[in-house]
Amino acid sequence: MKKSISLLLLSLLMITPSCQKPKEAANEYNIVPKPNQIIPREGRFELSNKVRLVVPPDAPEVKDIADSLAGRLKLTAGITLKEADSADGKQAICFVMEKGMPKEGYKLSVTSNLITVTASQPNGFFYGVQTLFQLLPTAIYGKQLDKKVDWSVPAVEIEDAP
């Protein structure tokens, strides 16, 4: 009888964890605060001196934000982004205006060939670039050149808004 009760209790203990709801996926990208949506993709965007920087014309505040990204990459990675009017199928970081998005909202899309930061307002571009910084190696926050780092970004789709 004791064996039967022990066996029954052991069976119940083994079944109980399988009945629990699955836990929310961890924020594998260590982005703080956690964005509303993170969709992992395959591949990485490799940063180099061949990467183009595409910013909408007549958007000086967005250009300032793009320049802050370019300046940080120059300082810490020794990478100089080439300003261009379009990506033209080349590796590029593109800033795209999209009307109708929330003021501080943004979309960040990273593929092996293209990084796109989409927003409707400068605030959204700012937060998109802050998220991009968090996807880069921590050396991006440094004050000196670090050539030993793998300067690449994991492919991902991120969307966030307050």
Model features per residue range: what roles?
Residues 1-28:
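Bacterial Sec-dependent N-terminal signal peptides
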